[in-house]
Every structure is written in structure tokens, then in C-alpha cells.
């Protein structure tokens, strides 16, 4: 690892450590009962993994690296699919990683914040920090490929309804995807209630189609559940089995969504819906596809394996099945898009991204957000992927490497949790981690073969976003250090300026990222306007390393004397920030604000790239560009535009 990479990681680590200064709050799912939440989880959490039967089995035997659809390979692949689901989804995520929640929330950034708190700022954590940030970057690549892959795969089913649809598959898929992104600004609260019932019906359809064909070969259930078939596959045809892993992993893509969405439903309901409903439905369908192919003679097998999912359909059910599959892929895509919005908000709050415009699409649900630049950026990339690859089979080559990379990183992060947070002894932790690492490395290695066929796409996307995230975090740290160098201590300023400057009526709020030094905007205001307000509030927004901060810990107000006050507003990394609304509630800590008598003073920095140690010039220029294009503090903190005064300053890093 280069020295520059280490400095970047330390910048990220510092950002997390800075975020880990305020209170803790448990946030868990609430509802009428575990069963209701489990049904809701089916509609949100399992969309990605639920649409895998459309292409996973097919890609093993008819993808870019096809294998012969004989009895050894079919039983071996089915056994690999089942035991992959048991080891990766059930054992790794449901039983282990989902126990490592950050006050009820999951996901790579939540886990990273949890680790930062447990390590208490130790510098040995910088490689783990880098891995966590890279997992976040890989998610964006996955959130571009998933909608393209899933919607294309379902749209291709229209050609089984009527061959006349074949030339229009790509245009229809593009129309659906563009429409999906276009409605994001309106929110999905109204149609979201339909997601659960639709996905329940979809999984029942998967199970029904599977049972229809398993009836011809019931013994396939025993063969699938028998791990000996997977081991025999590797023993008799090891290289082919390794190649097959690259496609088998498509059956578990979306496993990380169980952890990421844990805050909405809870570990118990997600585990219940997985083990009692989703897993059986998926496996029945995979076994049905295998039974159908095995029942055919050698010649027809080649035709069936070209698209086994849609070949399972009875003719009279073709259109309903295709429509239901299409709805399921739209719901899966929606979940990924919403996940990208949520992850972006967390990244902004934790200091990994510049301020971006965040719109709240629901008055009742704080989690319903819309980020325009993320939405349109994803849409452009999804369109390019659909046009560039042209079919779900081609896209499958690009799919998997980002997911397996993220799964490997989750295991790395989990190893830190086991040893430093849970204090597991080596004899207990090492066998668990050994299983996780062996499975993850095998899948990641098998997917590396796909790099020339399209696997490079998510890697390039991930590396690009990783560069942006670490550049912003490092640049922000350098800028804050530069501004803090010449900052005057607040007590000295209060004593020297309070009596000498002319005081005018009203309240002035000066926003500052540091609660120690005098804000630059205050110094500039005094220098140019020669006055101070009767009441001066030095306001700092602090983001905790927990998702939600309770009302009782919203603020701390300190009287500094001479009409000066220090006010700290505390937020969790998943809470929306609304400064005027918060100021109306600070009466709980002894303050009272009249908005019509309050002015907000902000400092807007202009960055000058200089040949100083810290970052290469190209990264300084990249950081300066990100700073210029970030959302203004006035809009991000929802300050009233007619009460805001902006004062500029130049900073060289």
C-alpha cells in the first residue's frame, strides 16, 4: 500500500473518529408483530436474491463459461447453490454478521462506524477503514448493474410469449428503467405497500413452478441437499467446478441486502422470512429447473438450458409469469436505488462525501429520501450498461465481482468485530472466519475469470468512487487543519472583542465545524462590518457514530459570557438535518430563538491547490472541484435564504 493511500485512509479514519463523539441510541424496527415485519421484509429485502432464478442456473450452463448439463454437473451445481445459500446467507449473514448491528442499523458504513468506536481511534485500523470505504464504493457499481441485469432478464421472457417482442426487448427494458428513475422524485410510499404482496405472490410462483417439475424427479431434493454431490463435483472435475462458482454466486447476490436493510425490519423478522419462506421457494425453483433439464434427452437439454426459468412455464401461464417476474425485478431495482440514496446520506453525514441535495419525499417516514444527482447518475450508467451489453447473459459477466468483493470485505470487517468488540477467543473465532474466508476467496477468484468479459466494469466504477470518497475525506481533513492553524481561541476573543465592538440588536448564528476556535465568518464580519450582535451563537453540527440520536441528547448549550453561547446539535448518521427546526426545540437545553430576529452567517471556502505535503496536485484539484459543486450550507441545513449572510475565504492546502 502506498504512503499516499495510507494518508488517505488516516483521513477517513479521522473523519469517523470525529463522528464518534456523541451519544448512543438504540433504533429498532417497530410494528404489529414479527410476522407482519417478516412479510414486509419479503417485499424489500429479498428482491435482489429473489430474482436470481431468472438467470443464475442458466448462466452456469449457457453463459460465457458454460459447462456440460449432465447429471454430475447438474446435481453438483444444485448442491453448490443450496450450500452456498446456507453458508453465505444463513450462517454468515443471518446468524453472524447481522448480530453486529450499530444501534439496530446494518450496512458497511454502519459496521465501519461501529469498528471505529471499538478501536478507539487506533491507527492500526486504517487498512480496515480503506476496505470499508471500498465496499461502499463497490455497492454503487452493484446498484448500477442490478437494475440493468434484473429488468433485462425479465423483459427477455416476453420473447417466449411472442417472438415478435424479440427486437424490442432492449427498448422495452430501457423504457421501464427510465420510467423507474423518473418517478423517484415523487417517492414510493404510495406504491410501497404493494411490494410485499407482489413479492409474496412472486415467491409462491417460484415454488409452484419448481414443484411442477420436481414431481417428475422427487429424488432431486435428496441429491441437492446432499453436500457429497458438491464435493464429488470438485473431486471429479475440479476446474469445471471452480468455473461454475462464478455463475453459482449469482444465486446469492443480494445477501448483503439482508444486513443493509436490517434497520427497517430487524434481524428476527428477516431471518424468519428467509428460513421459512424465501429459501424454500428459491430452492424449489432451482431444483425444478434442474429436474426439467434432467428429464429431457441430451439434444433438447441444450435448448432448455438456454433459458430454463421461462421454459418451466406452462403455456397458459406464460404472460402472467413474465409480468410477475417483471414486477419483481422492478421492485428489486427500487430496493437497490433506495439503498443507494440511503448509503449516500450516511456517507455525507460521516464525512465521506460532499454535501448533496437531499429531498424528503414523505412527511411521515424520515427514511424516504431522494438525491437527484445520485438518481440521474445511476440512470445514465444503467442505460449505458443496457446498451453496451445488450442482454442479461452478457451483463452476467459483469455481475458478481462487485458482490463477491463486498462479501469478502464484510468478512474482513467482521473479523475485527469478533476479536475487538465481541472479544471472541481465537479457538472460537478462527474456525468461523476460516469458513467465511474460504468461501469468499473461492467465489471472488472464480469471478476474476470474468474480468475480460465485463467484470472490469464494476471494478472501474468502484475504484473511481473509492478515489472520490477518500479524496474528499482526506481533503476535508487537510482543509480543517489549515483553518484551525490560525484560529483564535474563543475565550480570548470573547474577552477582547466583546467590549470593544459595537453591539447591535438581534441574534447571529455562526456555523462552524470546530467547537474550539472562532469561526472565520465571525472574524470576517467583525473586520468588515465592525459590529457584533447582542446575542452570538457559535453553532456546531456533530454527527454521531450511531444512526439516531434521542431527543434528550439533541443539543448542548453553553454560556460563554458577554452574550456569546456555544451550541452543539447532535444527529445520527441516518437523521435528516434541519437547523431552523432544531433551534425551535432547543428550549430543552435552555435556549430560545425567534427566527425573524436571527441571522445566519456562513463561511464559504475557495480552495487554492498548493504544493504542500498532504495530497498530490491532481487530488487537490479534484477536491477543489468537489467542494465547488457541493450543496451550499444554506440549502443543506435548510436555512431561510432571507436570513443568511455568506462570507468568503481562501484556503490553501
UniProtKB/Swiss-Prot annotation:
Signal peptide: none annotated. Keywords: Cell inner membrane, Cell membrane, Ion transport, Membrane, Potassium, Potassium transport, Symport, Transmembrane, Transmembrane helix, Transport. InterPro entries: K+_transporter, K_trans_C, K_trans_N, Kup. It is a multi-pass membrane protein. One of its GO terms (cellular component) is plasma membrane. Its main location: membrane. The keyword Cell membrane applies. One of its GO terms (molecular function) is symporter activity. It comes from the Bacteria. It is found in: Cell inner membrane. It catalyses: K(+)(in) + H(+)(in) = K(+)(out) + H(+)(out). Disulfide bonds: none annotated. The chain crosses the membrane at residues 37-57, 74-94, 125-145, 165-185, 191-211, 233-253, 268-288, 321-341, 369-389, 401-421, 429-449, 451-471. PANTHER family: LOW AFFINITY POTASSIUM TRANSPORT SYSTEM PROTEIN KUP, OSMOTIC STRESS POTASSIUM TRANSPORTER. HAMAP family: Kup (MF_01522). Belongs to the HAK/KUP transporter (TC 2.A.72) family. Transport of potassium into the cell. Likely operates as a K(+):H(+) symporter. This is Probable potassium transport system protein Kup. It comes from Sphingopyxis alaskensis (strain DSM 13593 / LMG 18877 / RB2256) (Sphingomonas alaskensis).
